[in-house]
Amino acid sequence: MKVSIIGATGYSGLELIRLIQQHSSVDIATLHSFSNQTNLLSNLYPHLKNLEASPLEKINPKDIIEKSETVFLATPSGISKDIALPYIDAGLNVIDLSGDFRLKNSQLYEKWYEKSAPLENYLMRAEYGLAEFRENKESTFIANPGCYATATLLGLAPLVKKQLIEPTSIIVDAKSGISGAGKVPSTSTHFTETNENMTLYKMNSHQHIPEIMQQLTKWDESIPAIQFSTSLIPITRGIFTTIYVRPKKPIAWEELHKLYESTYENAPFVRIQKENVYPTVKQVTASNYCDIGLAYNEITNVITIVSVIDNLVKGAAGQAIQNLNIMANFAENDGLGFIPVYP
């Protein structure tokens, strides 16, 4: 299968390129960038010297449609909603890594993203691509989930789908590595600001909140809201999410563990930890895994869920390829079947 990547020079686009090199059935047809349209990729990124024959081309929809079966959009929010339309209309597989098509309510999109919403008919056609819980596996237009949303939803799904928790009890403390802020530098991502530091940001206003709520209320419509905080931590990549919920009735750890194991028994990239073992960011680095650890406090009647992913892989490019594999009926782990980088 031939694919094109629009936004190839951003972190998610670069990760798509890396992962596709390992895929048995996918080859890159064209690469595109808004900021660098006439350069060789290897000139910008020497670590990709093996790809010297891969030029960055101007975005020409007609040319892309002729050369590709699938288009990955690794662009910032606010861009995909316009440039995706020719490829959707032409019947290509389209996987958008931005937030443009995730929210079905256009007013919510405009409130949380502070941009004009995509056209309604395209919003309705997009399938939310939480890979382990895809509703329509034949959909050819995928809104790839956000990194925080992926870690949070995979952590909560077994309990919420069974409606086992108090609807008002969900508290999520999510932390991200610096690459989650993207490639464009800013004061908040400057080395001197992030090194040996931890910063709370977008308190109660992160754009992944409505995305998480949209999916949670599909599973349990009684959930009114979540308390969700995000922090920047001084690591390059990774999402570390700690989730606290109250079960409707006490639950033994063994029962809790069995619930998670059974939910994800056919999910090759979700790994449930043993008792008193809690995942670290390091154990999923550069992989498509989501590792989940569980604890239950009988005294407070609180379940603690620790869910970790690599924000650039499972939280972006890896899940996008996983969604392509599902869509094209490839092996789900094709291009993704490698162990994490350690140490």
From Swiss-Prot:
This is N-acetyl-gamma-glutamyl-phosphate reductase. NCBIfam families: argC. CDD domains: AGPR_1_C, AGPR_1_N. It catalyses: N-acetyl-L-glutamate 5-semialdehyde + phosphate + NADP(+) = N-acetyl-L-glutamyl 5-phosphate + NADPH + H(+). Gene3D superfamilies: Dihydrodipicolinate Reductase, domain 2 (3.30.360.10), NAD(P)-binding Rossmann-like Domain (3.40.50.720). One of its GO terms (biological process) is L-arginine biosynthetic process. SUPFAM superfamilies: Glyceraldehyde-3-phosphate dehydrogenase-like, C-terminal domain (SSF55347), NAD(P)-binding Rossmann-fold domains (SSF51735). It is found in: Cytoplasm. It comes from Listeria welshimeri serovar 6b (strain ATCC 35897 / DSM 20650 / CCUG 15529 / CIP 8149 / NCTC 11857 / SLCC 5334 / V8). Pathway: Amino-acid biosynthesis; L-arginine biosynthesis; N(2)-acetyl-L-ornithine from L-glutamate: step 3/4. Belongs to the NAGSA dehydrogenase family. Type 1 subfamily. Catalyzes the NADPH-dependent reduction of N-acetyl-5-glutamyl phosphate to yield N-acetyl-L-glutamate 5-semialdehyde. It holds the Pfam family Semialdhyde_dhC_1.
